[in-house]
């Protein structure tokens, strides 16, 4: 027997993908008042877009929330105390966007290895200048946070002949064909000292906030490149700018930032050794369609009493 419920879609944007819900009983709203008519019955909340404050207000006004789903993989804009302490399961879109972020990470590695900035600058200036570039075959990449995004990175760099290291809270007991060596978080500095490229793909939690700061940059090679495709505040940007300006590291490829949008005048716009993406490395032509299709499959599973995928540990934040 199907589990009856109404899907409450918290959405600030009029994305065309919302029309894919037309086969379900649902309400789309930008204010708590929009959901008042459904708040007394069993509901599923889809956090599609919008501020945490709105999601919290909708959650608190509903009497029978069965499940909450976050469109994105990151949960820092979804978690609030009442949801964390409740028995309501929370799922996310982890895995939906990983492939594109893995591709961006590889592109950033090649950008610095082949010095594409120099090529483009010379082309624009009409300068013919030959110079040496690097091979990434035989170099080492360290992945800080080996979840879906981290695995997507490993899948792309491993065939390029790179040695792949990874930090994971609970390293697997069996061998992983993509990883040469796992490190526990307490050995992060040891791993960083070995890396030519460091890819941060961590969720944002109290434990991961500024996990990469002055001490971590000091442990890196002066030729190291840092890439962030997880959450901006995982990296202490002030410490990173100091390291980049002093050339204590070679460069940084960034898709996420502590403050978004990045304010005009921020030094990262001007640094020659920074590759900057305005948090759109996963914005492919299909990304929102994929996100909605994943939710629809989740809703089918929920309706049929099947286990949900991507159930997160709310106390850990991922």
Where are the predicted features?
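N-terminal glycine-/charge-rich "phosphate-binding" loop or analogous flexible N-terminal tail
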Residues: 1-52, 303
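Short loop/helix-cap segments at secondary-structure boundaries that form the rim of catalytic
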Residues: 16-23, 35-40, 58-59, 78-85, ...
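A short, aliphatic-rich alpha-helical micro-motif
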Residues: 35-40, 59-62, 136, 190-193, ...
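Phosphate/diphosphate ligand-binding glycine-rich loop within oxidoreductases
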Residues: 43-120
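Phosphate-binding beta-alpha-beta segment of Rossmann-like dinucleotide-binding domains, i.e.
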Residues: 88, 93-140, 148, 152, ...
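Rossmann-like dinucleotide-binding domain for NAD(H)/NADP(H)
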Residues: 90, 223, 229-318
